[in-house]
Amino acid sequence: MLQPKRTKYRKQFKGRIKGVAKGGSDLAFGEFGLKAQEPNRVNAREIEAARRAITRHMKRAGRVWIRVFPDVPVTAKPTEVRMGKGKGSVEYWACKVKPGRMMFEIDGVSEELAREALRLGAAKLSVKTRFVQRIAE
């Protein structure tokens, strides 16, 4: 699963996801893509599950690019533990996704196959997404 090799700090504040994606909102590598429509935190497990669903449907034809990386540590305290006594330990890694962010890109397959593969991948994610396609010039 995806996670940073090392970080400057072990734990982070929760923060908020404001505004729309400035960068990473256009197709950069592939012909087809999956674009986020709402803000949310997407964890590493969801990204990996979506990647597996996409590659499995494509039957190893074409190429997949993952355009998001889980770099935010999410902490949690154990169950039935009283409040206080410090912040909980890191449970999983997540990625803060803003609306308009390109999450996955694929190339080397037909539009029908790409649309279905990305639909299956989108079902694994906790954000509403949209299928996008490069405009022919």
UniProtKB/Swiss-Prot annotation:
This protein's UniProt keywords: Ribonucleoprotein, Ribosomal protein, RNA-binding, rRNA-binding, tRNA-binding
Task: Write down the Pfam families for this protein, in alphabetical order.
Answer: Ribosomal_L16
Q: Which GO terms describe its cellular component?
A: cytosolic large ribosomal subunit
Q: Does the UniProt entry include the keyword Ribosomal protein?
A: yes
The organism's superkingdom is given as Bacteria
Which one GO biological process term can you cite for this protein? Answer: translation
Q: Return the CDD domains for the record.
A: Ribosomal_L16_L10e
List the GO molecular function terms.
rRNA binding; structural constituent of ribosome; tRNA binding
- By its UniProt entry, which InterPro entries does this protein fall under? Ribosomal_uL16, Ribosomal_uL16_bact-type, Ribosomal_uL16_CS, Ribosomal_uL16_dom, Ribosomal_uL16_sf
Would the keyword Disulfide bond be found if you checked this record's keyword annotation? no
State the disulfide connectivity.
none
Function of the protein: Binds 23S rRNA and is also seen to make contacts with the A and possibly P site tRNAs.
How is the subunit organization of this protein annotated in UniProt? Answer: Part of the 50S ribosomal subunit.
Which NCBIfam families does the record associate with it? rplP_bact
Similarity field: Belongs to the universal ribosomal protein uL16 family.
Q: Which HAMAP family match?
A: Ribosomal_uL16
The protein's name: Large ribosomal subunit protein uL16
Q: Which gene encodes it?
A: rplP
